[in-house]
Amino acid sequence: MKKTLTSITLLLVGSLVYYFIYGSQQITQELKRQVDMHLEVLQKNGFAIEEREIKESSEHFVLHYKDPTKIQKYFKEKNIKMKTDDTQMLKGFKLASDISYMQGFYSAVSMDLYPVALPEMIREKTTQNDLNKMQKLLKEKIFLIHLDINKIFTSFKGYVKDIDTTFGTIKVVSTQVKFDGDFTTQRLTASTSSIQEFSINTATDLNISLKNLHGTYKQKGDSPYSFDSKQQIDMIAIQLSNGTSVELKNLDFLNNSNSSDQRINSQFISKFAELHIIDTQNRYSIENLNSKISLEKLSISALETLQSIDINNPKERQKLNKAIKMLITDGTRLNIEYIKANKVLDSSTNKMVDGFDANAYFTLNKNINLREIQSNPFALLSAVESKAHISLSDSLYNIAKKRAELSLILLFVKPISKEQKKIFDITYQNSHLKINGNQIF
């Protein structure tokens, strides 16, 4: 028995030694061949490969965004949509890649990606002093993404290097940005991501901060349009130059999408525990603001056509109009299943009062005339059909009446009173608007 165990142990050790010495070398050569093949494709499609250095188990190169016209055509063939203006803006951008092969037990390929040259358009519009500062930051690899791909090419993990730096009058902080996921040869099948903190602070114009974001994505089945995604954020704060500030706490976003028979049905759910808006004169606060919106029977064919069209190309205008008509007249329906708030701040008393709830749906007439709408946008009103239900607490209704922009409307629109609530049932059909059964126009 002891000899058997010893033999098995020696066999395992020998196998591992063979793998790490000989098998690893063979795999490294195959990985290098694959990289060569992909770089050759990129070179034929507008990119230039510069400063390439190849070593036994690693290599370095710089990917130069050189020919925007060729690159845009290549991206279009790969179903990656980029506007012509956006494509031109990136001309001259350079991204360096440091690749290591077969590092450790997990990784087949490890890479660091970081910019080494700004687009020409940015360089031309930047002062030499600021350009020198930016170039110094690029040399320090301030913006760096690390990525590991596992040895059976089914999953990945990575992170973004922490940032705490200043660009002129703009301070940027980013900490603990991590991601991982699973994939096949065709597409991403699952992923998670997290950000501990992200903020942009300017001297005068705008300050934005975000804390503790966690996101997940999971594909369902073979269709890229069938998936579940979820994001949770502890806090988002925005400070504007005019003194207005916005703060949101404990945010949840869920998106459930399913596809069948060339149609997409999606649900979007959002939850905000707290929303605070403060300007120079007023303060607005809402507790437990929740919504659920669904989009039904969205045409996959029309959506994919729209994604492939260059809207700046006049030759594709007819194709664009056809896709839009298919998208909006093929039974597509938008449902606002609910938008509701538990409590709303009465700023005059600084006390929270009962809130509101609402629901609605919108559809478009299948016989819509796009040419008429293009020449007369108001013609769209005759093609819309909608119903809505809005319920305000008595306290919130009394607050609304005090606002100048609403008081005049409420003089002509009388609500239904029921269970300490004010109710508005709204119908819009055939260019006629009714509220609580009374025709407004």
Q: Regions from the language model: what does each represent?
A:
Residues M1-V13:
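N-terminal Sec-pathway targeting helices
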Residues T6, Y19-F441:
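Glycine-rich, small/hydroxylated-residue low-complexity segments
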